[in-house]
Amino acid sequence: MSEAHIYPVKQNIKAHTHADNDTYLAMYQQSIKDPEGFWSEHGKIVDWIKPFTKVKHTSFDPGHIDIRWFEDGTLNVSANCIDRHLATRGDQVAIIWEGDDPTQDKTLTYKQLHQEVCRFANALKEQGVRKGDVVCIYMPMVPEAAVAMLACTRIGAVHTIVFGGFSPEALAGRIIDSNAKLVITADEGVRGGRAVPLKKNVDEALCNPEVKNISKVMVLKRTGGNVAWHEHRDIWWHEATAKASDNCPPEEMKAEDPLFILYTSGSTGKPKGVLHTTGGYLVYATMTFKYVFDYQPNEVFWCTADVGWITGHSYLVYGPLANGAKTILFEGVPNYPTTARMSEVVDKHKVNILYTAPTAIRALMAKGDEAIKGTSRDSLRIMGSVGEPINPEAWEWYYRTIGNEKSPIVDTWWQTETGGILITPLPGATALKPGSATRPFFGVQPALVDNMGEIVEGATEGNLVLLDSWPGQMRTVYGDHDRFEQTYFSTFKGMYFTGDGARRDEDGYYWITGRVDDVLNVSGHRMGTAEIESALVAFNKIAEAAVVGVPHDIKGQAIYAYITLNDGVYPSAELHKEVKDWVRKEIGAIATPDVLHWTDALPKTRSGKIMRRILRKIATGDTSNLGDTSTLADPSVVDRLIAEKAQLK
């Protein structure tokens, strides 16, 4: 193999694995040569009410983007995640909840989860929620968040989860776009010892005059904090479920019925509602969970993601539960109340598989041995990384320090849009290279293309595309199929463009090099530069703004904002704080710029287009080769920006 550090497959993993290297190669070849045959067989990993006979109907052709899988089959997601396990493991733990406060925890068995989900599903029906209605979930990381998701799927309602860190404005935008009928929230959330005012944010969001369809708000009592109450609109969760029956037959859903909408940032400002459907998504989440994490019966799996992100959907709730796993739902943050909290949780619950983000790993790495103080982490068998590419130094630290050099790391590459993991090692099959996502999962056909769309072979770099569909692929942008085609299929005709660049080495391993479009990846959260720019320009003292990402040791990317102010407004420490607070309010803390670079003018072409390529280079200090600046309306702007950058503290 080509790279300096190679970690061969561990013999103890290989001895009891779902797929060794020979199995991987044989299955992968079949999945590419005969996708119909492959998915016809592996589609049976979930239980169907009416078995499918049609497997794959997909087209990436311009003007005919159409993705359908298992389309004549019917099933229910909640029945696959709960009911099918009741006879064999009804008394086994399904969800382990670990509170923000280390003294708080609880478990739900599959039987208890079934009861809770049925009751809440009936409570939703009582409030008029019907099959096909959209329900917005804005919840803390408590078991009821998973219960709410599963209750929606039980009755055929479509959920759209909004991360609890988003502001009222961002929440309102998602409620409006999805046409949600009901909101599920809590009085407050708790995170890192602080209360998060969820109900207050919902109340503010619903004041937006464009929010027209919300008839009810279901409120979970999490902290008992004071909240405003709207008598005919708001309902306490505990009161609604107290009188609900715990018998709720699962709704029979078509494979292509919508399952959920999840908003993700685009480069054009307005967030995109990624639509996933029932059959293909569940097959893919179930299959990837089983093989990527090499899940064995009775193991404890901990995905540290929030349910508000796709990782929480696929690998905290649906993938684990469909496989009958024990899944941990963690309310807190990895370094509270102690730096070693993540390791403490691993020991406390004897976690076998840990799936976390490079951001968390880098933050803990900065603390050295404090991150593992007083812990052994002996239970760990497999570790994973998700959200952004992991740099080799962080990979090595994670492997050595957290994993005691005995747990292989699955460095997984995928997106909200893909529904599940696309490029990844398999623990019993793949020799590891720190920093490489390695090889494609079954049925996934990656390719690298140059900027003209020509496929480039061998060891090379290029734009990462996918040549054919897989069951977990998003079907459309909610309410805007043209935008779906425009965003993902117009750059390179007949291919799905991921928006990422990648390098392929001589062993065929993929190394993700990051976004090639104007989307930032901050702490594993994707945000469009346009969304942040829009928020900045909406501030009454700002004339213009341009946002770029710069490398950051902990977060992966930091947000660097170039700002021109209105006439008569001058930079000050006070304005600096005002601008940051404004973005926090408009979008959320995650979008707060790390650097504000005040300037008089931005580099623009004569047609008025901002030259972001130049801004990126200046922000990262890479000014030796700025490329062609002849198209700039005023080339002197560049020298001014470089001088200003040098003055920034």
Curated annotation (Swiss-Prot):
The modification N6-acetyllysine is found at residue 609. GO terms for biological process: acetyl-CoA biosynthetic process; acetyl-CoA biosynthetic process from acetate. GO terms for cellular component: cytosol. Acetylated. Deacetylation by the SIR2-homolog deacetylase activates the enzyme. Keywords: Acetylation, ATP-binding, Ligase, Magnesium, Metal-binding, Nucleotide-binding. One of its GO terms (molecular function) is metal ion binding. Belongs to the ATP-dependent AMP-binding enzyme family. NCBIfam families: Ac_CoA_lig_AcsA, PRK00174.1. Catalyzes the conversion of acetate into acetyl-CoA (AcCoA), an essential intermediate at the junction of anabolic and catabolic pathways. AcsA undergoes a two-step reaction. In the first half reaction, AcsA combines acetate with ATP to form acetyl-adenylate (AcAMP) intermediate. In the second half reaction, it can then transfer the acetyl group from AcAMP to the sulfhydryl group of CoA, forming the product AcCoA. This is Acetyl-coenzyme A synthetase.
